[in-house]
Amino acid sequence: MWPQPRLPPHPAMSEKTQQGKLAAAKKKLKAYWQRKSPGIPAGANRKKKVNGSSPDTATSGGYHSPGDSATGVYGEGRASSTTLQDLESQYQELAVALDSSSAIISQLTENINSLVRTSKEEKKHEIHLVQKLGRSLFKLKNQTAEPLAPEPPAGPSKVEQLQDETNHLRKELESVGRQLQAEVENNQMLSLLNRRQEERLREQEERLHEQEERLHEQEERLCEQEERLREQEERLCEQEERLREQEERLCEQEERLREQEERLCEQEERLREQEERLCEQEERLREQEERLCEQEERLREQEERLCEQEERLREQEERLCEQEERLCEQEERLCEQEERLCEQEERLCEQEKLPGQERLLEEVEKLLEQERRQEEQERLLERERLLDEVEELLEQERLRQQDERLWQQETLRELERLRELERLRELERMLELGWEALYEQRAEPRSGFEELNNENKSTLQLEQQVKELEKSGGAEEPRGSESAAAARPVPGAPVPQGAWMCGQAGWTPQEHPGLSGEAVGTGEAAGGAEEAACHSFRAAENRELNITII
């Protein structure tokens, strides 16, 4: 019987061996990480069972590792845990790849060794057979060459026996030759297979060399990362001590935060009451708008009356000018009369002898004085009347200007109040959206303990700003009633045509340049309040996240 070549191992058996190797590699990895990780406290597993939290989400309930204990409070802990997980996954992948490659290499080497052994044994066996056949042929040749002694013809002669043996040996040689040819062909096929397998093995060896180089590089990186991890572990140990101190502080802060939540609930109730008040104010504003429309019609009528009064004043001015001209003429006449009287006096002085003439002169002088006094009194009365009329007109203009200013101020106040109402509504909407986002994000811890102090300060600032807004809202409610009463214009007071348009269609600084500074100032103040409210809202959101972490 010829020796049969060894077959490669069954694939199912190779898979089982690979699985066993993988399990062994995993066990080695676990043992390696247990050696590298620092001492875990004794009560860690108990805390895990009591809290019922998974090792990925639990942060303060159980101490899993120095990387896991700091997650949720510091960003460095989370980064270290992620790097550890990445390194573990990479290391596991590399270990699996090494195990699989080593298993494949071992299988291929075993196959090659078995094939080499079979080929060597077959060659030895063939050489041994050839040697035997050569010896047998040599013996036969020697026997045929030697002269045979004649023997008695008792039976078949030795020559015949030798011929029979030679024929039998030839047949055996032919069969052996055929077998040798078949074996040679098999050996050629096996040699081809061996060459192909050797080429594949060379390619695999090259790949393995590349993988080994990569593994060496990765091992160097892992060593560096291990050093970094050791440093991080030392830092984490220090952080654990700090965290224990911070937990006590956090308990105190939780109580404070609960009190702040109660305050916020009270503030929400107050905001709801303010919303109701704002709705009532909106209804009042609508009524005021209707009244203002009626007042517009009255103002138009007053404008028409004022135009008529202006025309009358112009006519009175013309009359006054005519009266002044007449008075000037009368003064000239009086001057002429005085000159004449002076001449008459001179003449009378010459005629002193005549007492009757003196009496006449005295009477004439008295009459002239009476006429002068009457004329002066008439002039004074007319001037007083004109002055009274002018003063009345000036007073009406002043009142009209004052009414315009008051009306403009009231319109600006109403606009500011409406803007504040809109801002308060926007703030309430933002608060509602913020509460919803906070309830959704309670399971995701984001910030650490160092940010808690800043966030608590921001929450205190938010409370102060809300109190200031409440105070300003309470102080502006009585102003609303006063502005509604003052918005009613005085009957008979003139109002310009573009005054109501600025309040109804939107005030523009081009129509009223004197009031643009006030409006801009109020807008800037409102913008600052909005920014402060947004900042405080963000602080409240961060505070809620810290509450969920605790």
From Swiss-Prot:
InterPro entries: GOLGA6L, GOLGA_cons_dom. Residues 51-62 have a biased composition (Polar residues). Residues 157-405 form a coiled coil. Pfam families: GOLGA2L5 (PF15070). Residues 467-480 have a biased composition (Basic and acidic residues). Keywords: Coiled coil. Disulfide bonds: none annotated. Residues 484-499, 517-529 have a biased composition (Low complexity). The keyword Protein biosynthesis does not apply. Residues 1-11 have a biased composition (Pro residues). The keyword Coiled coil applies. Residues 1-77, 467-529 are annotated as: Disordered. PANTHER family: GOLGIN SUBFAMILY A MEMBER 6-LIKE PROTEIN 10-RELATED, TRICHOHYALIN-RELATED. Belongs to the GOLGA6 family. This is Putative golgin subfamily A member 6-like protein 19.
